[in-house]
Design a protein with these regions (language model features):
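Eukaryotic proteins' extreme N-terminal regulatory segments
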Residues: 12-13
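Helix-rich terminal scaffold detector
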Residues: 3, 62, 94, 99-120
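Compact, glycine-rich, soluble single-domain proteins
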Residues: 6, 16-17, 21-94, 106
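Extreme N-terminal tail/first-helix region
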Residues: 1-7
Length: 120
């Protein structure tokens, strides 16, 4: 059996609503968004800036609708209003159909991009 690391969840064009360097760490994501793409509290996520060059990994936890908050040291790498991609991966020996959503200016879902497509 050979395991591959495959995309399972993606929040495309999320907007950071706050940065708090004094928090212990992690990213706070609206519960509605976590549910939409199958993310769990404590799950490892990758955060890639669309408007800058930062790329980090941290763990996610659920927050209020519309929230995308960067906490801890990672807050020094991002700014409120910055556009990011949040992704999570899973190990599998079978294909995974990733859950992908495109977000609008207020972190609302504007398009369900599942099934996976390279066409925006």
């Amino acid at each position: 059996m050979r395991l591959s690391q495959l995309l399972k969840s993606k929040l495309h064009h999320a907007r950071i609503t706050y940065c708090n360097p004094d928090y212990v760490g992690s990213i706070e994501i609206g519960q509605d968004l976590m549910d939409a793409v199958g993310l769990q509290d404590g799950e490892l996520v990758h955060i890639w800036s669309v408007t800058g060059t930062s790329r980090i990994q941290t763990y996610a936890f659920a927050g209020p609708r519309g929230t995308i908050g960067i906490n801890g040291g990672a807050a020094h790498f991002f700014e409120s209003g910055e556009k990011v991609i949040i992704a999570a991966f899973d190990l599998s020996d079978e294909p995974i159909l990733p859950k992908i959503v495109l977000l609008g200016e207020e972190n609302q879902i504007v398009k369900d991009m599942t099934p996976f497509s390279v066409i925006g």
